[in-house]
Every structure is written in C-alpha cells, then in structure tokens.
Amino acid sequence: MSEEREENGISRATLNTQRLSAMIDSLNNEKDDRLFPSPTTTRTMITEEKADQSDVFKPPSRLLRSPAGDVSLPPGDNRSSMISNYSGIIQEGVEVSYVVKNRQQTQERRTSKDSNSLYSLKEPVSKNELPSLPMLPSEATLTKHLSDNQSTKSNTNADEIVIKPVTNAKPVGRFNSNTSKKVEGRGSLKLLSSPLRQEKVMRSSIGSGNLASESGSSTYNTKFHQSIQEQLEEEEEGNVSDKLSIVSSVIPELYTTTNEAPKAINPIRSETNDYNPTIPPRSKDRPRSRLFIEEGDGEGDLLTEEILPTPVQPGGHYKNSSQISTVSEQKSESYYSAATSMPPEEETYLTRPLPSTPNEDSRVTSNLKRDDTLKAIHDRANHTSTSTNKQDDDMYEDIIEETPKKTKLKKDTKKKLNKKKSVKELRSFDIDTLNQLLSVTKGTLIGSEFAQLGMKIEEKRALERLVDSLSRLTADMVLDPDRYEEGLKRLDKATKALEGF
C-alpha cells in the first residue's frame, strides 16, 4: 500500500509540474523567446576529419564590414548569416569536361574515385592525382586548319569558333566545395588573357579561355597571317560604324523651302478720312470782339453770304444795325482746324500776289481811340430797306449832352470841364458794348478766323497769338480806365516793332 501511495504521489507531482510548465509556457511571448533563446545542444562527438577541416577552413572571428559593425560569429557548426538563413557552403560543384593525355590513366582515376567514398575526397590530393594540362596544338595541325578555312571565309570580321567532338574526353566527378578549393589553391589554371600575350603566342582552345563542352572539345581558329596594322584598322572601322549608327539615330533638322515671297493680306474693309485734331475751348481770359450777331431775320442772310469774301474797312461810329456784321464762318455745324482750307500745293504759296494796302485817305492820323477798330461790313441790299425803319427805335445810341453857355465864375467852369472829361472817357462803355462782348462767340468757330487767308499752319498760329495778345490788351483798356494810358503806350511799341523791314 505504501508503494502505491508513493507512486500516486509521484504521478501527481509530475502532473503538477507539467501543468505549471504549460502555464509558464503559455505566459511566455515571442518577445521573451527572442530575448531569452533556448539553449541548444552541441554535439560532443566530433571526428578527427572535421577537426582538420575546421582548422583548414576556419571562418573569420568577426565581420569587418557589416551593418552592425564588428560582430562576433558563432562557431562553425551553427554558422548562419545575419540577414538570411543561407549557410554559405556550396554542396555541389559544376560538372565540366577536359581533355586528358591518356585514356588509361583517366580510367584508373575514375575507378579509384568511384571506389573511394565522399570522405576520401576530403583528404589532401597529391600532385600525381591532379589533372594534367592538355598539350598545345602543333604547327602541322594549325596549318592544316588554316588551309581548310581559307576556302570558306566568314562574312564578318570576327574570328570563327569550330566545335568538334573529342573521343577521349571524360567528365569530372562532383566535388565538394572544400576539395575544389584545395585543388584550385595548389594548381590553378591561369588563362592567357593579356592582349600583348595573345599577339605573340598563337591562340588555342585553352589559351582563349574556351574549354570543351560536355559533348566535346573546341578549337579556336584565327587569321594568323594578319598583321597588327590590319587589326587596328578593323577596330577603327568598327568604331566608325558605331559612330555612324549613333549619328543616324538622331533626328535631323527639317528644312523647308518657300518658292513664293510672302504677301500681305489685303484688309476686308478700309476707309480714308482727313485728320482733324480737336480744337481746345475758348479761353475765358480772351477778350471779346466788338461785333455781335444780329438776332432775328439777319441770320438767314448771313448763312447765304458766308462764302463771299468780306471787304475789311476801317469804320467809325455806326448808327444803324445794318452796318454791323460778323465774321463769316464755314462749316458751322462741325469743328475743323485752320489747316483744312489750306491749299495742298506749296509752289503757289511763294508765287501768290501780295495783299492790297489800305488807302491813305482812310487812315486815321489822330490818336487811337476805343471806337477806331476794324469792322467787317456786309452789303445787304435786300434787307436794308425793310429793317432800317423798324429797328431805329430799338437801337441804343450815345447821347451827347451839350453844355449850355453860362456866365459864371471861373471856379464853376473848371468843375464842369473835369466832369466833361470823365463823361467822355466813360461814354462809349454802354449796354451795346456789353452785348457785343457777351455775344461774340455766337455762331462763330474757334480757329476759323484766318481760314481764308491761305497761310501755313505756323504763320496762322503766330497770327492768332498776336491777335489774342492785342485783344487782351484792348479789352483791359476798355474795362479798366486806369490802364488806358498804359495800353496806348504798349500799342505804340507794338506798332513800331511790327513796321517791317
């Protein structure tokens, strides 16, 4: 009974330990497994051959060039890469065939290799067991191949490669990576790949680096009598062809030729108009003229007679409205510059006749007065007989008061003389003068005063400036009696300056 109890206690203890271990394992995460790797069992049984192999092919203790810097590696049994699971050991070799000297020797080596196991290959190989290098072809065989190939020339300049089967070719057995490394380390086959060496020594299948395939060997045929200069020329020709192909691949420029000269396209619609610049408005400071337009029936007659030239005469005091006229204008509905009526021909400008001089009888030799201004008189024969009798009563005339002769003291006569002088000075400034100043621009065009003179633009502008300055001076003389004497002096200076040559 005691034994059964002990067995039951042991079984319960084992069950409890198993349950605890399962619970602990369930609590563990993958991160814990990575942080605390399980201890791996290492094999204690190592053969002497593996020990020798590890001594010969001992891996480096550290990785000098790695992403993590200098990292120590595990021993050779657990060797693994840091990035992948690749072990870095080649298990099989590539099967190649080579030319042997004697068939019997190869058969003996083959049988010996077949008899030995894979572990026998790991033993060091003696010099006698190494494969011997093939013999170079003789001159007789080379000349024979040359004579055969001269009949059939290749189209290209490249050398021909002729592959023929070899009877005594035997394949090489599969080697381990360790044994292959040992063989190559002791006696490696160095290829003659330098160009200077190839020019001096005749090429063969081994010298050119082309070993025989599994089905047979290969012989390398070349043009032996070709000189170095010809080879250089062929290389240059090849380079030229490459350059030409590169140049031809570039798209050339496209040139176009036009046989006809370019012509301008005619407009669909064209109009030609005279250039008429705008005329600035009349200045407010410009003085008004003494003439005004008569309202009523006289406007129709003025429009009919605007084309006729108007004679200019010096006039004195006028009593009738028929004697009052205005400057005739043309094209009153639209504004035109003074250059529109200018004749286009300049030759006639120099050969034109001189203007007529005024008569000496009509000149006023006395001092200048305010009423002695030039007036344009229109001859109206049809309208004078009907309009004179009706408008005599409506017109304003200067009233001249005659001073009666009185016998008084000298003091009274002096006072009367002073009054007469003041009345004479202000006598002509009446309502008629105000009407003339206010209605001077009615029906007139600015800039057309000198349109009928036939002058150039520069001369017309100079004349307009002169008339403008004179009209300002006379207007100031009329409006301000204090400036009358000064105005007379300036007019005298202006007439002296404009007398001529």
From Swiss-Prot:
Provide ranges: composition bias, Polar residues.
Answer: 11-20, 148-158
- Describe the processing and modification events after translation: Phosphorylated by CDC28.
Tell me which positions the record assigns to the signal sequence.
none
- Subunit text: Interacts with NAP1 (via the central domain consisting of amino acids 143 to 362). Copurifies with ribosomes.
The species is Saccharomyces cerevisiae (strain ATCC 204508 / S288c) (Baker's yeast)
The gene behind this protein is: NBA1
Q: Give all Phosphoserine modified positions.
A: 138, 208
Protein name in the entry: Protein NBA1
A GO CC term attached to the entry: cellular bud neck septin collar
Q: Where is this region: Disordered?
A: 1-78, 102-133, 146-165, 267-286, 338-366
Basic and acidic residues compositional bias, start-end: 46-55
Which processes are annotated in GO (biological process)? axial cellular bud site selection; establishment of protein localization; regulation of protein localization to cell division site
Q: Upper lineage ranks?
A: Eukaryota, Fungi, Dikarya, Ascomycota, Saccharomycotina
Location in the cell reads:
Bud neck; Cytoplasm
Keywords (A to Z) from UniProt = Cytoplasm, Phosphoprotein
Q: Note on file?
A: Present with 6490 molecules/cell in log phase SD medium.
Residues that the record marks as modified (Phosphothreonine) are: 403
Q: Cite the residue spans of the region called Necessary for the normal cellular distribution and bud neck targeting.
A: 275-501
